[in-house]
Structures are given as structure tokens and as C-alpha cells.
Curated annotation (Swiss-Prot):
The lineage of its organism: Bacteria, Pseudomonadati, Pseudomonadota, Alphaproteobacteria, Hyphomicrobiales. Belongs to the class-II pyridoxal-phosphate-dependent aminotransferase family. Histidinol-phosphate aminotransferase subfamily. Pathway: Amino-acid biosynthesis; L-histidine biosynthesis; L-histidine from 5-phospho-alpha-D-ribose 1-diphosphate: step 7/9. Its cofactor is pyridoxal 5'-phosphate. GO terms for biological process: L-histidine biosynthetic process. This is Histidinol-phosphate aminotransferase. HAMAP family: HisC_aminotrans_2. It comes from Methylobacterium sp. (strain 4-46).
């Protein structure tokens, strides 16, 4: 009989660093501009809100466990087979389910140096070993990833574009990565920010999924679609991979309001176009303005920028964060990603963007080079 006085988690669980979301509060009496979680300033599609409200009179009913209406809507938009689509409570859930289905103790999962923190959490939760591939210029390095592959590798995770850096790999490089992987290694393309990318050499990965047995693409409704509160994600996968995930997925992991809102949002092309147009206007404006102030900004194709600060007393990211927070401007510290001297800023409303630019201009002026 065990001598423990209370239930004890299995070995390794308490060693996992819990994910800490971006801050969402400002000092009392100060107008809040939350730019810490890459949420769209345009909000959700009115059609999605209306569809969600229509479900409110039937909350006693279980949702459709297969999310068929949402899968059909997604399939229609992208020309996919609905049977190869799995929906989840955000793409985070799907990333975790993929890991639990294909990884266990003794296995390894590879992700790039500044990749999404959820990959590490999911790998450790599955009993696997995280393997970090170094990046080059804050961008995933295909050669470094391939060099990290061993007979124990089960999954390679690639956020493309990457969060928090905003960098991306051209599709030719993604193809080269896939070509270099053994057939029994699953390549997971996390395309959470794909809607925002306007580069001729970028592709989210649908074509590669269609022609491969070991590639999955995940997407989310939390960013460009403005439905973060409803937690809606989806993935498209080879039939065998989708089947494995469905076997361990919760039976009602997506509620009726989320299913209805997601299906309506997919059909509202004009709303997505407006969100992308806003980002196309403000991403270069913010980048240029911050650079003119004297700050270094990693070139981004997402709806956010990574701003670098000097490693110097009084002038660093922590001090800048405190300065901004006192003015109601909430950015994201990214020290947990190994970037202690940087802040990530969501491209927000015109008012919010201008406020951050003005505040950082004042911060840099008040904290000049020594």
C-alpha cells in the first residue's frame, strides 16, 4: 500500500511549466488597450454573433459531437473532404490530441527554438522528450530540424508563421523539410496566422497534406476570425491520422454556439478581408514607426510584431513593459520563449497602435543610451 497521503501526479507532470496567457488588465482608471494575445481589433463577424445567439434557446441539448456543419463549411471553403477534418476546442486541443495519439515515453518531438510553448507542454504531458532545433535570424532552420531527427522522433511541429517571432518559411522550404523526414514521422504544420500572410512564396500546407500520409495542418478561429472566446480550431489530416485523433477526442469537445458561429464566420469572406486589410495597413506602419524610434523589430507576416530592447539597466523589455502597462498598454512579455529582451505587440486598432508608438517614443527619449 502506498504511503502517500494524497494522490500524486505521475512522474514529470509537476515539472511542466504551465502556460501563462498574456496579461489583460490595466491599472484602475486607465483606458485599457490589450495587445498581448494577438486578437483582431475588428472583432467577430456579425453573422457569427447572430448564429451563436440563435443557439441560446436550446442550451439544454448536447451539440453535434462531430461538428458536421462546421466541417462542411470548412470543406466547402477550401475544397476538402469533410471526413479528413477534425474540429477542436482551439487548435491547442488538436495539437495536444495529435501528440497524445502519436507519442509516448521514450519518443521525441522536435520544434524550433522560438516555437509555440504548447508543443513542449504537450510533448511532456505525453511522456515524450522535447527536442529544440536552433533557429537562424529568429526563423525556423530546416537543416537544424532535420539534424535533430533520430529514430525516436515521432512528431515535428512547425508554426508557420511562427509565434512570437512573426517569421515564416517559404513553401519550398516546408517541402524540403517534409522530403527529409522519415515516413513514420508526423509533420504538424501549425498555420494559426495563415490568413494574414500575403507572400507569394507562402502556403499554409493544404497541398502537402493532400498528397502525403504524414502531414497535418492545424488552423484556428481565434485570430483573424475573432472568435477566441469560443475556442474553435480545426485540422485536416490523412484519414488514418484523423481516425486516431477522433478515437481519443472528447465526444462533445465543441459546443453548439461555437459550431454555429464558426460555420457562419467561414462564409463571411468580407469580414476576413477587412481584418486582413487592416493588418496590411498597420503592420508596416507600426514596424516603420518603431524602427524610426530606434528599436529593432523582427520582420513579421502575422498580426503582431516582436520588438527588441537593449539589455541595459532601465532600458530593457521589463522596464518598457512596466512603462506601457502604467499607461494601459498591455503587450506580451516573451521571456518564457527565451526572448527576455523583447515584447510582442498585437497590431490593434488605430488608436491603440498610435498610443503604443507614442508611449515607446517617450520611453526611449526618457531612457537614452548611457
Amino acid at each position: 500500500m502506498s504511503a502517500a497521503l494524497r494522490p500524486v501526479p505521475r512522474p514529470g507532470v509537476l515539472a511542466i511549466e504551465a502556460y501563462v496567457p498574456g496579461k489583460s488588465a490595466a491599472p484602475a482608471g486607465v483606458k485599457l488597450h490589450k495587445l498581448s494575445s494577438n486578437e483582431t481589433p475588428l472583432g467577430p463577424s456579425p453573422a457569427a454573433v447572430a448564429a451563436m445567439r440563435e443557439t441560446a434557446s436550446h442550451l439544454e441539448l448536447y451539440p453535434d459531437g462531430s461538428a458536421a456543419a462546421l466541417r462542411r463549411a470548412i470543406a466547402g471553403k477550401y475544397g476538402l473532404d469533410p471526413a479528413r477534418i477534425v474540429c477542436g476546442a482551439g487548435s491547442d486541443e488538436l495539437l495536444s490530441l495529435l501528440t497524445y495519439a502519436f507519442m509516448g515515453p521514450g519518443d521525441e518531438g522536435i520544434y524550433s527554438e522560438y516555437g509555440f510553448l504548447v508543443y513542449r507542454i504537450a510533448i511532456l504531458a505525453a511522456g515524450g522528450t522535447p527536442v529544440v532545433a536552433p533557429e537562424r535570424d529568429h526563423t525556423a532552420d530546416v537543416d537544424a530540424i532535420l539534424a535533430a531527427v533520430t529514430p525516436r522522433t515521432r512528431i515535428v511541429y512547425l508554426a508557420n508563421p511562427n509565434n512570437p517571432t512573426g517569421t515564416y518559411l517559404p513553401f519550398d522550404e516546408v517541402r524540403r523539410l517534409h522530403a527529409g523526414l522519415p515516413g513514420d514521422v508526423l509533420l504538424v504544420l501549425d498555420a494559426a496566422y495563415a490568413e494574414y500572410v500575403r507572400r507569394n512564396d507562402y502556403a499554409a500546407g493544404l497541398e502537402l497534406v493532400a498528397e502525403s500520409e504524414n502531414v497535418v495542418m492545424t488552423r484556428t478561429f481565434s485570430k483573424a476570425y475573432g472568435l477566441a472566446a469560443l475556442r474553435i480550431g480545426w485540422m485536416v489530416a490523412p484519414p488514418a491520422v484523423a481516425d486516431a485523433v477522433n478515437r481519443i477526442r472528447g465526444p462533445f469537445n465543441l459546443g453548439s454556439p461555437a459550431i454555429a458561429a464558426g460555420a457562419a464566420a467561414v462564409a463571411d469572406d468580407a469580414h476576413i478581408a477587412a481584418a486582413v486589410a487592416h493588418n496590411e495597413e498597420w503592420l508596416p506602419k507600426v514596424t516603420r514607426a518603431l524602427t524610426e524610434i530606434g528599436l529593432s523589430v523582427t520582420p513579421s507576416v502575422g498580426n503582431f510584431v516582436l520588438i527588441h530592447f537593449p539589455d541595459a539597466p532601465g532600458r530593457g523589455a521589463a522596464e518598457a513593459d512596466a512603462f506601457l502597462t502604467a499607461r494601459g498598454l498591455i503587450l506580451r512579455r516573451v521571456a518564457a520563449y527565451g526572448l527576455p529582451h523583447a515584447l510582442r505587440m498585437t497590431i490593434g486598432s488605430a488608436e491603440a497602435n498610435e498610443a503604443v508608438i507614442a508611449a515607446l517614443r517617450a520611453f526611449v527619449k526618457d531612457h537614452p543610451d548611457a
